[in-house]
Amino acid sequence: MKKILLFAILILGIVSCNDETESTSQLPPDAKPIALTDGQAKRVGQDNGFAFDLFRKVIDFSKETNVFISPLSVSIALGMTWNGAAGETKSEMESALKMSGMSVEEINEYYRILQTTLPTIDPTTKLTLANSLWYRSGFQVKSDFLNVNIDYFDAYVRELDFSKAWAVDTINQWCAKKTNNLIPSVLDNIPEDAVMYLINAIYFKGIWRHQFEKKNTTQADFTNEAGEKVKVNMMFQKDTFAYAEDEKAQYLDMPYGNKAFSMTVILPKNGNTTADLLKYLTVDQWNSILQNLSMREVEVYFPRFSSKNKFLLNDPLIDMGMKLAFTDNADFSNIVDENLFISRVLHNTYIEVTEEGTEAAAVTVVEVGYTSVPIIPEFRVNKP
């Protein structure tokens, strides 16, 4: 059984649409909605669908006690890689990432807008999204592939001697810098067949719109999903929040800053677990929950905690339909004309929730390598 934590920037929820009065006027003005075209709005829904699917698969495959992922980070890193795919490999990636019905230009423009707009919509919240592309010295990458990652993903591109011991340190130092040192290391070594790393890093620091007072934090029991009671530092406040409940759970939306970003908490009831709810939760159901939230005074008890995770996402992504990309039959001919495949997708995360707010980070690494060289049979006629 798992105590499940989700920190995913779900784009449909980044701007509050609730205009009801809050308990104090000494608050930042609400964020202005991001202007999206119909196609970009459609892509938002697709990306959120990918987020829910990925989260469910990670829960199924992970043995971690706590599960905390950033689907946005995974989506961006795979979006960079998708530009190098071709044929059936590309089609499978589009299906897993839920990109159907959109052109290459529309998809890349969507990622560009995310990365240029999200960090600016709340001046009280720090959000950075950074991308990089590292390739082995002497590896001849097609210029179109490099250019699309520079133009749309603002990727830092560097040729690196992967055979040197300091190559790992160089990549890890970039990740550490882009996550405010919350994720200091993502790679232990670079395999001999690795030729490229496509990396996304996200850092988030948000201050609660309604902060908890430290004097109200006390030791209290917390019952995990195994039914065990453990002592935690339980924060408390009474204020006005967007809230709803049904026969399955209670729902609470706790905004940061100007409400551009928020943490929506699901508290199961009537014998349900978080895993039970998430197993069947769809984007449409999630949107319905958000629309049913209404402002009311709530007494909030919330644990202060921190958590970090490391995941290998190969199996979850394969189970989502991205099969060929991880095999010798993969087609990444838009990177080079040689035979390449995705050898690993690594995902590291960190989150800390305190009385003041939330600090979190995520790094997704897509490792691309040469496929195994096929054994050529020898037929030597040197005897009758």
Locate predicted features.
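Short Gly/aromatic-enriched secondary-structure transition segments
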Residues: M93-L97, F212-Q219, T274-D284
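Short loop/turn motifs at secondary-structure junctions and domain boundaries
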Residues: P377-K383
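Detector for small/aliphatic-rich hydrophobic stretches
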Residues: K2-F7, I14-F162
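Short amphipathic beta-strand starts and helix->beta connectors
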Residues: D60-F61, E247-A249, V283-W286
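Internal alpha/beta scaffold segment
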Residues: P268-S294
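Non-catalytic, conformational "gating/processing" segments within enzyme and secreted inhibitor domains
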Residues: V104-N270, Q291-I376
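Non-catalytic interaction/Regulatory regions outside core domains
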Residues: I4-L5, L27, N339, H347, ...
